[in-house]
Curated annotation (Swiss-Prot):
Gene giving rise to this polypeptide: rlmN
Disulphide bridges: C126-C363
Keyword Ribosomal protein: no
Name of the molecule in the record: Dual-specificity RNA methyltransferase RlmN
Binding-site list for S-adenosyl-L-methionine: G187, E188, S219, S241, L242, H243, N320
InterPro entries listed in its UniProt record: Aldolase_TIM, Methyltransferase_A, RlmN_N, RNA_MTrfase_RlmN, rRNA_lsu_MTrfase_RlmN/Cfr, rSAM
GO cellular component: cytoplasm
Amino acid sequence: MCLPLILTIKIINIIINMFNKTNKKINILGKTREELYDFFIKIGEEKFRAEQIMKWIYKRYCDDVSLMTDFSKNLKNKLKNIIKIDHLDIESENISQDGTIKWVLKINDQNIETVYIPEINRATLCISSQIGCALNCKFCATSYQGFNRNLNSYEIISQIWYAMKIINDRNNFKLKKITNIVMMGMGEPLLNLKNLVPAIKIILDNYGFGLSKRRITISTAGISPVIKKLGKLIDVKLAISLHAPNDIIRNKIMPINKKYNIKSILLSAKKYISTSKANKGKISIEYIMLNEINDKTEHAYQLINCLKNIPCKINLIPWNPFPYVKYKCSNFNKINNFYKILIKHGITTTIRKQRGIDIKAACGQLSGNVINRINKRNIINF
């Protein structure tokens, strides 16, 4: 039975008054289309308003309701009282000689880093999912910051929104539009699934950023139970940060391996790609090259054996230096030899180009500009 019109209006007014009294406006950046449908219905508006406002936010990078020309004056005034479109502010910008840009974004007294990497045929945005990281990978600068907290969905989305807005505003500089997004910044994405999934839904939504699922990559150190859950929630490309050919080495450089070993990670990943359309039947394996740690000829053959039943492609990553750790990157000859062995055995392999190393924006170097505040751990020697 439908409620009388007068009663319906009273309920809507009560809801709006509640927003006004608490003086807590809802930040709609980072809200999925479904969440916005519910919101507009609750305040007595048609659900298509959700699609309109998403177009303004994610296609035109508008954060001011008063500029949304297809909203009536009454609706604008109504929304101004109950919503906000907040995004993170920039603390600093660094531009590399190779065109890579690193933005440090401020979150209260903390910050996160986001990296824009232009290439010939595409431009990739590397975003963060946490402030710091709890996994303590020995070769990664973020782990030396320690873990602060998960980013919420608006903070994840804000990185993309900000980067796309800058590129749009600087069109005279001919910056390439972002074509790919990788969750390879600060933090372990799969330990923040609650906020990651809504953010990815917005990235994929045609009323959001509208990117293809094959252009979104989640990189994980290997949280096996969450990989199993992921396929039921979202379908995007998955990359496993393996970085070792056996559990003995991986236990030393990636302590999470003591909980989720290589076998369990690869089995979970194999199951994920079996139902994923985004991955085209192959999982990406990331392998950082550490001198005398995991780069010997015997390690290449161990890796081949480890992956013999896993449809995959391997990305060899030269290690990028940061303070307090005495690792060294494998030299070119070692990396090239490792590469040739993998190729010879039929494994699709690439060597990642080092980008943004001069501004500490390369793989493994992101630390949120807090490296000087870190409790300096013992130097790692092997």
